[in-house]
Amino acid sequence: AEPPDASIELIVYAAASMTETLQEIAGLYAEAAPNVTLTFNFDSSGTLKTQIQEGADCDLFISAGQKQMDQLDIASSPEVNTEGLDFVDTDSRVDLLENRVVLVVPDGNPKDIQSFDDMAAGLSDGSILMAMGNSDVPVGQYTQKILRYYGLDEDALPPSGVLSYGTNVKEVTTQVSEQSVDCGVVYCTDAFSAGLTGVDSATAEMCGPVIY
C-alpha cells in the first residue's frame, strides 16, 4: 500500500455545469489533502461519455444526466446501453445532487419573456430566438422534454430560425449573456454563475428530475 502522504492524481470528468462548484471544492480539498491533485476535464456529459468510451483516462465521472452514465454501465438495460459498454463500476454510482432547469433572459429582457409559457408562445409564432443545448447533451435533452411538454416539434418550428444551439450549457449561457438570443434554457447553477436573470423554473412534470 502507498504511504498516506504519497502523491495522488485523480482525473475527474465533470459536466460543464459543475465547473465553478468543483473548482471551489478543489481549493478546499487541497487544504485537507495536499497530496491529492484533482485534474478536471469539463465538457458536455455527452462529449465526456464519448471520451471515456474511447479509452481516455478517467477516475471519476460526474454526469449532468443519467442517460450518459447508463450508456457506460453494463448493468443498465440494453435499451439504454445499446452497445453493451462496461466503463462504470456499478457499485460506485451515487446520485450526487439535484439541479434545476431554468429559463434565463439577457439584461433588460427586451422581449419581456416572463415564463416558459411566454417562451412557448414566442417559439410558436417565430417572434423570439432561444438558445438551447444540442440534442446529445443533458441540458439539450431536458429542453427537448420541455418543448414536447408544450406540444412543440423542434423540427417543425418556423424555418426563419427560432433556435440557437450550444455544445454545452456554458455556450448557451454565453449566448444569453452576449444578448445574441432572447432567452435560453440552462441549469440554475449556471444562471447564478453567469449572473443571468432566471424568469421561470421547469417543474419535474415538464422535464423530469435533474440528477447528477
Label the model's feature ranges.
Residues 82-89:
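Short acidic (Asp/Glu) patches
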Residues 89-90, 202:
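Intrinsically disordered, low-complexity segments enriched in polar/charged residues with Gly/Pro
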Residues 59-63:
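Periplasmic-binding protein-like
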Residues 55-57:
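Charged, often glycine-rich, active-site loop that binds/positions anionic groups
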Residues 2-33, 37, 41, 46, ...:
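Exported/periplasmic ABC-transporter solute-binding proteins
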